[in-house]
Regions:
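Short, solvent-exposed helix-helix connector turns and helix-capping sites enriched
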Residues: 1, 135-136
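Alpha/beta enzyme core
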Residues: 1-101, 109-130, 176-178
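C-terminal extensions of enzymes
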Residues: 128, 136-188
Length: 188
């Protein structure tokens, strides 16, 4: 109501000059990493990396890390999944900076696979939101507990007692793709 709301949207970047910021902004080049480092001591991670060439450029231009992401499938829903992009990116980065991966990770087994394939960390989004929406803080805590337990069960079953012991020898590509509609999703 007008008693407590002005009716004016106030985004988190209110007060910042956002002129020229956008996906097609010609000023948005790899040099922005150096400009950002001039004004902050925070680590600069580049999100949205999906190919080896971009990950190599992120390293070259001084990024402190990258996030392999297709923004939950909303940005590039017909491209490869991020887990499919990960091996070439891990190879290009070659341990020089951390690699976080997100988009589509729902279970502890998903987290295990990403770590085994070379991710430094895995971002989880929607499961937290589902927990929050259903049960508030307790729901978020339960989601965290479930993901942790699933990861630990997978680690025990694989004989990997620590996160650092998880490696590529513990996952493999079965060499084929399961066609859409063959996973039971059509029943949902």
């Amino acid at each position: 109501c007008a008693a407590c709301h002005t009716g004016r949207a106030k985004p988190i970047f209110d007060g910042l000059n956002m002129q020229g910021v956008g996906l097609n902004n010609p000023a948005m080049t790899w040099d922005v990493i150096a400009r950002m480092k001039e004004v902050t001591d925070m680590k600069i991670f580049i999100k949205g990396i999906e190919v080896a060439a971009d990950s190599a450029l992120a390293v070259q231009y001084g990024a402190d890390g990258i996030v392999v992401s297709n923004h939950g499938g909303r940005a590039t829903e017909t491209d490869k999944g991020t887990i499919e992009c990960l091996p070439e990116i891990v190879s290009a980065v070659n341990g020089r900076i951390p690699i976080i991966i997100d988009s589509g990770f729902r279970r502890g087994t998903d987290v295990y696979k990403a770590l085994a394939m070379g991710a430094s960390a895995v971002g989880i989004g929607r499961p937290y939101c589902w927990g929050l929406g259903a049960f508030g803080q307790a729901g978020v805590e339960r989601v965290l507990d479930l993901l942790n337990r699933e990861l630990l069960i997978t680690m025990v079953g694989s004989g990997t007692p620590t996160i650092d012991s998880i490696g590529p020898d513990y996952v493999h590509d079965v060499g084929h793709r399961v066609p859409r509609g063959r996973l039971g999703r059509e029943l949902l």
